[in-house]
C-alpha cells in the first residue's frame, strides 16, 4: 500500500519545494502535485531527490479567470495539445506515474465529442492518464461531473492507459454513497484520492469505512497509489494520525 501526499494541499506551512522532503519525513511513500509548472524542472528534481511522483495535472489555464483545462472545450484543441505536451514533458522529467487530463468548463454533445477525441490523441503517447469527475457545487460548469458519465466515455473509448481518478470526497459529494461508486467503478479506477467527508479535512468519518476500503484494495486488484488530498484542520503534521492508523491496520492484515 503506497500513500502519496498532495503537495498542493498538504505542508502548505512551507514553500512548495520544501514539501517533498517534509512528506518523506512524515512517512509518505511519494507525492502528487496539481500543477508543477511554477518552478524549473531542475529545481523540482533537486527537491524530490528521487522521491516518487504519483500524479500531476495538465495545465488548467488561468485558474483565477475560471479556466479548468481544455480537453472538452470545442475550438481549444490546439491549446489542449500544447498544454498536454507540456504536461508530458514535465511528467517525464519528474517520472510521474500518471497525468490527470483536465476537461475544462463545457457541456453538451460537441464538448463530449471534443473530450473523446482529445483523450484518444493524448493516449496515443503511451503515458498512463486519468480523468476525474469534479462535483458541480465546487466546480460549477466542469464538463466531467459524474462517475457514471466518466465510465461510459472510457468504456466506449476502450483506451487501456486511461483510467478513472477515484476521489472519495468528490464521489460522495456527487453521488452521496462513495462506497457504491467504488463498487461500480473499481475496475476502471487507476488512482485513488482520499479526504474526510463532508469537510474535506483529515481522511476518515462520514460513514465511510476508510480502513476497510484501503485494506481491501489489494484483494480487488488495485495496485496504484492512495493520495491524500485534503485541507488539514490545523498544521499538516499534527493531523497525520490517520496515516499511522491505516498503515498499522494494513500491516496487521498483511497488506
Language-model segments: which ranges?
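Active-site-adjacent beta->alpha loops and helix N-cap segments on the catalytic face
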Residues: 38-47
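Histidine-acidic metal/acid-base catalytic patches
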Residues: 1-4, 8-9, 13-27, 86-89, ...
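Active-site acidic/histidine proton-transfer and metal-coordination neighborhood
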Residues: 70-163, 253-254
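Active-site-proximal loop/turn and secondary-structure-junction residues that shape catalytic pockets
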Residues: 9-11, 35-37, 59-61, 103-107, ...
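Residue-level detector of anion-binding/catalytic polar loops
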Residues: 29-30, 52, 97, 128, ...
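Conserved beta-strand positions in the central sheet of alpha/beta enzyme cores
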Residues: 32, 54-57, 100, 130, ...
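Alpha/beta catalytic barrel-like cores
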Residues: 19-22, 32-36, 68-69, 76, ...
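N-terminal small/glycine-rich loop or linker at the start of catalytic domains
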Residues: 1-8, 55-71, 134
